[in-house]
C-alpha cells in the first residue's frame, strides 16, 4: 500500500467543491492509499532527517463532514512513499525552509510533488523568462525609470508583485494614468523590491486560461477565468468567472513546448496561465482548477492522471 503524505493549509477551512488538494486526497483514498496529513507547523528536522507529526486522514465528499483524523504519529518523512507539497503561497522564507526539510526525505527515497529544489528554482512569475518566445514583453525591475520607460513604450501595461497569488496587487496602467508613480512606489516599496511589468493583452476579455500539465502531459481541457465587468483580472479569487473548455491550438503549442522541461525538473503538477497565445505565469507551488475542469468534462480525471504518474515514478524508483 502506498503511503501518501500531504502538506497543506488547514483542511478544516477549505471549500471542498473547489479545492484541488481535496480532489487529490479523494483519488488517493479511492486507490486504497494510506493518507497522512501535515501542516507547515508539523514539519521539523532532527539529526539531518526531515520529520513530522502526521495524522492519519480519511476524506469524504460531504459538505458538512468532509474529513476525520485517525492516529497521530511522529515519523521520519522517508517513511512515506510520496509527499504532496500543497501549501499555498506566499512563497516566503518559511516556505523555502519547508522545502529543505522535504528535500531531506527526497534524498532518502521519498517522491516529493513537486520537487523541492525546483520549487525554489522556478518562481511562478520569473520562470516564464526561460520561454521568452512564448510570453508578453516582460520587464522585471526595481527602477522607476525602467518601469516608466516600459510604460511609455507600450502605453498600456500590467504591473504586479513577484510573490502575489489570486490576482492581488495587480494593476493595469493605461496611457495617461495619473497614478503611475504611486503604483510604482507601492509595488517596489520605494525602489527596494522587484516587480514585474508586462504589456497589456486585450485577449484577457476571453479569459485567463489555466492549463494543467501532469508529469509532462498537458490536460486536454483548461479553465478560462473570465474577468468580472470592469475588471482586468480573471482570477476566481478576484471575482472572475470560470468556464471550462478544450485547449486551443496555441494552448497545445505552448503546453507542449514547456512540458518536457517541467517533467525534467520534477515539476509533476503544474498550472500554466495563458492569455490569448501568450504564456504569463507557470504555477508550481499549489495549482488549482481541477474540480472545475473535472465537473465540466467528467470523462477526464486529472487527479487520476496525477496518481498514475506517481505510481509510475514509484515503480521506476524500485526498478
Swiss-Prot record:
EC number: 6.3.2.3
Entry's Gene Ontology cellular component terms: cytoplasm
Family indicated by similarity: Belongs to the prokaryotic GSH synthase family.
Entry binding sites for ATP: 151-207
Note accompanying the cofactor annotation: Binds 1 Mg(2+) or Mn(2+) ion per subunit.
MF terms (GO), sorted A to Z: ATP binding; glutathione synthase activity; metal ion binding
Keyword Flavoprotein recorded: no
UniProt-listed NCBIfam families: glut_syn, PRK05246.1
Pathway(s) where this gene product acts: Sulfur metabolism; glutathione biosynthesis; glutathione from L-cysteine and L-glutamate: step 2/2
Positions annotated to bind Mg(2+): 281, 283
UniProt-recorded name of the protein: Glutathione synthetase
Pfam families named among the record's database cross-references: GSH-S_ATP, GSH-S_N
Occurrences of domain ATP-grasp (ranges): 125-311
Keyword annotations: ATP-binding, Glutathione biosynthesis, Ligase, Magnesium, Manganese, Metal-binding, Nucleotide-binding
Manganese listed as a keyword: yes
Reaction equations catalysed: gamma-L-glutamyl-L-cysteine + glycine + ATP = glutathione + ADP + phosphate + H(+)
Cofactors: Mg(2+); Mn(2+)
